[in-house]
Regions:
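Amphipathic alpha-helical interaction segments
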Residues: 68-72, 126, 146
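C-terminal helical/coil "lid" or tail adjacent to the Rossmann-like core of SAM-dependent
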Residues: 82-142
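Conserved catalytic/acceptor-binding region of the Class I
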Residues: 27-95
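A short glycine-rich, Lys/Arg-flanked "PGG" loop and its adjoining helix->strand segment in the class I
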Residues: 10-25
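Core SAM-dependent methyltransferase catalytic element
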Residues: 76-79, 96, 144-155
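Short conserved AdoMet
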Residues: 7, 21, 78
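A short SAM/SAH-binding and catalytic strip from SAM-dependent methyltransferases
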Residues: 1-10
Length: 155
């Protein structure tokens, strides 16, 4: 699962298609952070990944790439392209594991995101902490709708 971090996903997919044997299947997990739904207590916490997407984009990472993968696989020549939704949420996943993921992101990105959004590191950390608190609260829901996409090389 790397397409959101590849500078030129169509070129990557075209190369994957070229390398596959006829009839071979390409399968990947694609991320789309708009599918990350957290019942955070503040508007800033709820908007976190919507606000940071334009900041991350110039680094070559596309946080909303998941929705484009179907089209891109078809455009480079894959056949029988399918989307397999995967929901990871607080009803089927450990809240502690989900919160740990957000803590890793917070600890790795707070300073960068704060600088590029014109916020203080404390304000950016508070956005992540709001999401983490919601994930850990058994009365709140959080989930991530991920997409696994597959396509077959023509025979």
């Amino acid at each position: 699962h790397v397409l959101q971090a590849v500078g030129d996903p169509p070129a990557f997919l075209a190369e994957a298609l070229r390398l596959l044997a006829p009839g071979g299947v390409f399968y990947t997990l694609v991320e789309d952070y708009q599918g990350l739904v957290v019942d955070a207590s503040t508007e800033a916490g709820r908007r976190l990944f919507l606000d940071v997407e334009p900041v991350i984009r110039p680094t070559g990472t596309h946080l909303h790439h998941g929705r484009q993968a179907f089209r891109e696989l078809r455009a480079v020549g894959f056949e029988d392209v399918r989307v397999h939704p995967i929901v990871v949420d607080t009803t089927n996943t450990s809240r502690a594991t989900f919160a740990r993921m957000l803590r890793f992101w917070r600890d790795g990105y707070v300073d960068f995101l704060a600088e590029h959004l014109g916020e203080t590191p404390a304000a950016m950390k508070a956005r992540f902490d709001d999401q983490i608190a919601a994930v850990e609260d058994p009365e709140r829901y959080a989930g991530w709708w991920l997409l696994a996409v597959s396509g077959r090389k023509p025979a």
